[in-house]
Structures are given as structure tokens and as C-alpha cells.
């Protein structure tokens, strides 16, 4: 029962068998920085420090160092000797840095130096901001956070795109995402069929191929990848609880493939009974009469991929005495890592809210997706030419033996754009006078792309164009180049995409102006 789990967990913390670990998700970007600052206000500036990291020399780099050493001295080493020497170099500290999310909190009645020395990350006492001004460097713990994580409280203040997407959806629609019901049937149906999108699997397959087209989860956080869409096709979840289980399967290691998937397919267990999160292990064992503390210890071992036992414990004997089924024990022994249920629930709540917008506010959903999720991967020259162009590009990437990470990212975004076109929605051409620097805008029932989705045109130049335009409209390509700080190659790209249509090359001067 939940009550049994709570009392067992309380007992564990009282006995100090587990150090609390707190993860907090904030909107990536500015909000994460604000949250980091707020911890200083909450606990005191002298009690909060960024967790330090130590970067060691990698294996390939070490191998290169040894080869270079031999070459510089005219020595000849065979490969085995080089590998032996490089093994001694690998892992040696090269520089220090800071953990992107880790915050170490020192008790108010203690000194941080009782736990760790302090230092500037990478020994840089001063840094330069984006405007070239000198600012103080970041003070971090000298020991890396793994070395002191069991001695001090660590907060993981993580940047996450989902809250950012939900905030944008609220801003552009005026709909409060907290009022979205988690039992909405149309939204739930997306995870087992694309029917709520007004599409059939055949229509989707004709545009994006056959992977995961019998569900409508394309582009949704947690569920949008081909792997997880395949999970949805195997399980056809019917409620929120089953969505949480699938999130647990996808975040775990060796939890789904060759484990829960086989048990469900072979009829050994149902979806709701298979192990998907850490809590499942502990709850199941308590329900079978295993002692709460033993149940907790087994869960801790299983979640870390360490099986049932640790250091001479007698956990297996207790499980056998409680008649725990063999399938459950076998499943535990296969697991490499298990996700916590509360974490999965938080992710699924955000994913479900975004899915609701996909069903009921499609244009807003795609505007938020392309603005935040597709940043840097929106292939404007391909997508803005229409569905046929997208199909052709997807076929080209699918035919590659080893597509690059950029091509894979582009393909995912093109698939979502193709789905959008199939739903009867479309893009406007990029407009020199109306496009935003970085946000897709909803204009007359269509999406207006921003400047930063143009190849090689980054955020900084996109902002310069918008700032210059606010002063007064561009009068020529020469004017755009000068005031918008745009290079000739980008001018050529804009020209080829039709963005500069009707704009003269140079300033036109009238005789009557004199």
C-alpha cells in the first residue's frame, strides 16, 4: 500500500540509510539562472556553492599524447606499449569546471571548508560577459560533487524545455495549463491512435515512413521518439497511470527490452504489474509480506543494477520465504537502472498538457514546438517548400547508412512539420518586416517563421535585424547589410529564399531630394 511505502520510507530516512536527493526542474534559460540565485537568498550566500567538476584526459587523447611524445623524441613504440603508457595518463586531471545543475548546500552552523576547499572554475577569477565586460568567475567546490555528495545536501536545479513550452502555450492562447484534465479522452487517445489529429496511420506513413505511425505522439516530450512510439504501439495505454509506466520503461536501462516487453507479450504479466519504476519493486515486496527495510534495500540495489544482494545480505532468502514469484526476481536481476515514479509522474503531467494543446490548439502547439524544441534543427529551405520537398529530404536521410546527428535532428523536425501540413496547417514565407528574431508567430491561421531558422543566421544577427527594423524599415540590401549586421552570404541565402523580393541592391537617391 502507499501508506506502507510512506512509513517504510520514513523509517529509512530516520535510520539515515539514505541521503535526500532533491531534483527541481525549471524552464531552461533565464528561469534556471533565477532559481540558482534564489537558493542564495534562501540558504544564504555563504552556504550555497556550485558543484565543481574535474575533467580528466580521455583515452584517445592520452593515446595521442604518448604517440606525440615518442615522435618528438625519435622513439619507436609498438601499439601495446603505447596503450600501456596511455592507460597511465588517462583520467589525469586536465581542468576543472562546474556542474550545470548541481548546487551544494552547507549547514548554517558549519563552515564549507570543513567539507571541501573552494576554487574558481577552470582557475578563472574573472570572465567576460556577452558585452565584453569583466565579471567575477564562478566559485565552485574544489572536490567534485561525487566525492562529497553523501556528506552535503545537493540540489539539482535542472533546465528543462517542457515548462518553457507550457509557458509559451499559455502566453499565446490564454489557456491555463493547470486546468487541463488528465482524463481527457481525446488527449489519451493520442497515445494509441492518430485519429484525434484527423489523420490515419496510412496518411502519416505516406509522409514520414512506417515507424510509430499508428499512434499520434510525434513531437510530444517523453513519447515522440521512434523507440517510445514503438512502446506505445506494443502497449496501447488506456489511462494516465499506464503512461507513467511507459515513461518509467523508457527512462530505465534493461527495463523494457528483453524484460518487461517479453513478459507482457508472453502473457506472464499485464502492463500494470510489470516493473517500471523503483517504487514498483518496494511496493510489490511489501505487499508480499517482505519487511519494509529489506524491500527498500532490494529496491536500492535493483535501481542501481546491482541485483538483489549487497555485501553478505540475505535478501534472496527473505524473498523466497515470502513466495515472491520467479518472474519478478528474474526481472529485477536484469535491470541496469530504474527511474523514480514521482519523477516519471512530473514528466508525464507536462507531456499530457502539451498533448492536450496538440489536439485542441494545433497551431499554438506547432508554434511552441518549432520555437523551443526545434531550435537549430528547423531546415527552412526544405520545410518551407512544402510536403513534397519534406518527403524527398526524409527519404534521402533514411537511405543513409550513417546519418549525422544534425541530419537526425533535422529529420525529426521535418516529420513534425509534415504532420502539421497533413492536418491542413501551413507556414507563411519569412517576412523581413514581420518575422520575429526567434519565435514562430501565429498570423492569419498560419505560422510565420523567425529569422534564426535561416541557415547560418544565428540569434545575435536575428536580434540585430529586428532592432534595426524597429528604427525604420530597410530600404535596400545594402541598408540591411549595414544596419542589420548581416554578411553577404546570408544576404544571398535570404535572396534565394525570396525574403528580399522587391528590395533594391543599393540605396536609391532621387534628384528631387536635393
Which residues does each predicted region cover?
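Noncatalytic, beta-rich nucleic-acid-contacting surfaces in large DNA/RNA-processing enzymes
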Residues: 1, 7-514
Amino acid at each position: 500500500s502507499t501508506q506502507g511505502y510512506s512509513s517504510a520510507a520514513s523509517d529509512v530516512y530516520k535510520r539515515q540509510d539514505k541521503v535526500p536527493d532533491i531534483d527541481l526542474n525549471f524552464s531552461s534559460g533565464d528561469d534556471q539562472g533565477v532559481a540558482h540565485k534564489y537558493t542564495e537568498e534562501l540558504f544564504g550566500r555563504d552556504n550555497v556553492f556550485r558543484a565543481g567538476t574535474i575533467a580528466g584526459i580521455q583515452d584517445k587523447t592520452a593515446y595521442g599524447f604518448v604517440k606525440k611524445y615518442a615522435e618528438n623524441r625519435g622513439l619507436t613504440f609498438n601499439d601495446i606499449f603505447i596503450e600501456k603508457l596511455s592507460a597511465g595518463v588517462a583520467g589525469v586531471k586536465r581542468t576543472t569546471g562546474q556542474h550545470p545543475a548541481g548546487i551544494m548546500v552547507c549547514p548554517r552552523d558549519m563552515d564549507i571548508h570543513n567539507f571541501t576547499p573552494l576554487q574558481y572554475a577552470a582557475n578563472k577569477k574573472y570572465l567576460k560577459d556577452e558585452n565584453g565586460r569583466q565579471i567575477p568567475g564562478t566559485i565552485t567546490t574544489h572536490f567534485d560533487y561525487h566525492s562529497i555528495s553523501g556528506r552535503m545536501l545537493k540540489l539539482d536545479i535542472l533546465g528543462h524545455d517542457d515548462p518553457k513550452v507550457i509557458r509559451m502555450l499559455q502566453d499565446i492562447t490564454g489557456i491555463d495549463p493547470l486546468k487541463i484534465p488528465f482524463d481527457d479522452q481525446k488527449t489519451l487517445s493520442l497515445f494509441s491512435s492518430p485519429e484525434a489529429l484527423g489523420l490515419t496511420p496510412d496518411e502519416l506513413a505516406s509522409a514520414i515512413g512506417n515507424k510509430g505511425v499508428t499512434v499520434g505522439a510525434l513531437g510530444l516530450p517523453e513519447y515522440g521518439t521512434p523507440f517510445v512510439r514503438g512502446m506505445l504501439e506494443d502497449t496501447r495505454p488506456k489511462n494516465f497511470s499506464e503512461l507513467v509506466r511507459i515513461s518509467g520503461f523508457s527512462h530505465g536501462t534493461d527495463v523494457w527490452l528483453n524484460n518487461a516487453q517479453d513478459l507482457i507479450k508472453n502473457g506472464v504479466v499485464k502492463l500494470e504489474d510489470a516493473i517500471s519504476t523503483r517504487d514498483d519493486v518496494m511496493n510489490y515486496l511489501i505487499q508480499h509480506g517482505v519487511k519494509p527495510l529489506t524491500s527498500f534495500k532490494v529496491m536500492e540495489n535493483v535501481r542501481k543494477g546491482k541485483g538483489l544482494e549487497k555485501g553478505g545480505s540475505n535478501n534472496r532468502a527473505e524473498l523466497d520465504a515470502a513466495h515472491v514469484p520467479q518472474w519478478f526476481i528474474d526481472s529485477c536481476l536484469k535491470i541496469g537502472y530504474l527511474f523514480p515514479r514521482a519523477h516519471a509522474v512530473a514528466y508525464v503531467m507536462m507531456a499530457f498538457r502539451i498533448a492536450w494543446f496538440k489536439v485542441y490548439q494545433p497551431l499554438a502547439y506547432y508554434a511552441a514546438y518549432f520555437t523551443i524544441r526545434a531550435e537549430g534543427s528547423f531546415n527552412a529551405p526544405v520545410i518551407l517548400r512544402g510536403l513534397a520537398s519534406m518527403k524527398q529530404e526524409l527519404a534521402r536521410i533514411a537511405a543513409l547508412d550513417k546519418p549525422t546527428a544534425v541530419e537526425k535532428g533535422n529529420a525529426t523536425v521535418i516529420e513534425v512539420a509534415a504532420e502539421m501540413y497533413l492536418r491542413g496547417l501551413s507556414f507563411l514565407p519569412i517576412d523581413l518586416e514581420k518575422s520575429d528574431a526567434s519565435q514562430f508567430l501565429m498570423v492569419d491561421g498560419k505560422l510565420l517563421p523567425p529569422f534564426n531558422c535561416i541557415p547560418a543566421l544565428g540569434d545575435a544577427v536575428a536580434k540585430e535585424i529586428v532592432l534595426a527594423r524597429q528604427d525604420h524599415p530597410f530600404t535596400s540590401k545594402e541598408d540591411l547589410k549595414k544596419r542589420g549586421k548581416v554578411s553577404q552570404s546570408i544576404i544571398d541565402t535570404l535572396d534565394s529564399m525570396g525574403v528580399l523580393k522587391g528590395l533594391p541592391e543599393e540605396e536609391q537617391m532621387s534628384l528631387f531630394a536635393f
